[in-house]
């Protein structure tokens, strides 16, 4: 895929709707149907070549947890772009012209169960802080996208539940412009703080309509806070809000009775 093509598509989508992957803002970036890769690629294989010579990153649902942390294929949080590319087996390019590893997103095409999309890595201060896979389109371009990602989302949710248990958090709400958002999140919690998270995030047309956007990925809140402290964006003594476990919440409620 030519860099100009990717940058044009992603720039267009940046002007549309965006969602948050945990505390990190993640922008949906997916190409319109007519621009999707033509090659039929198995999602169960490693990164493979399309008929146009592109390298497609595989989405391996079993590879989102390593040593108790939510991260993709063991890529350490705050790894360099080069380290991530070596593990993924592809070269990623800036989502927009002018983006760099100090603060930016880097993308490459992917395909999963017949749906074309992108993998995106968010970097801050030269380190990876989130990795996600995006399918479909944004709210501004949904009329040009005739797909429905409901079946794919259901499959991912089923697989994640089998692999990682029931989600720790489920969000279901209507957006101001009428479309519906639904999200699922699995959390790694240490000392009451969310360290890393795995998420599924979906956007639907109003009144239970078709799903036109799907994001699947992991992020590190701990890494993000660490970097922001290093660059002086937040104070050194900053502490994230403590997340209570269900047992702690129950004890707290009993104590107030």
Name each model feature, range by range.
Residues 108-138:
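Mid-chain, structured segments of secreted extracytoplasmic proteins
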Residues 12-22:
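Bacterial N-terminal signal peptides
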């Amino acid at each position: 895929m030519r860099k100009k093509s990717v940058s044009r598509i992603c720039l267009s989508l940046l002007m549309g709707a965006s969602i948050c992957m945990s505390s990190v803002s993640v922008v949906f970036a997916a190409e319109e149907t007519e621009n999707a890769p033509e090659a039929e690629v198995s999602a169960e294989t490693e990164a493979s070549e399309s008929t146009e010579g592109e390298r497609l990153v595989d989405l391996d649902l079993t590879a989102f947890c390593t040593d108790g942390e939510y991260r993709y294929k063991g890529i350490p949080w705050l790894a360099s772009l080069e380290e991530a590319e070596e593990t993924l087996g592809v070269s990623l390019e800036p989502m927009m012209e002018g983006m760099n590893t100090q603060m930016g997103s880097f993308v490459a095409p992917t395909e999963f169960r017949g749906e074309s999309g992108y993998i995106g890595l968010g970097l801050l201060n030269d380190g990876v802080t989130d990795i996600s896979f995006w399918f479909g389109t944004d709210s501004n371009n949904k009329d040009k996208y005739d797909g429905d990602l409901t079946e794919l989302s259901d499959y991912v949710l089923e697989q994640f539940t089998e692999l990682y248990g029931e989600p720790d958090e489920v969000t279901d709400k209507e957006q101001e412009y009428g479309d519906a958002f639904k999200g699922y999140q699995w959390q790694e919690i240490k000392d009451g703080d969310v360290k890393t998270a795995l998420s599924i995030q979906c956007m639907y047309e109003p009144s239970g309509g078709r799903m036109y956007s799907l994001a699947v990925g992991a992020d590190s809140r701990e890494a993000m806070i660490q970097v922001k402290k290093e660059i002086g964006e937040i104070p050194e003594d900053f502490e994230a809000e403590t997340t209570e476990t269900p047992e702690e919440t129950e004890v707290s409620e009993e104590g107030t009775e």
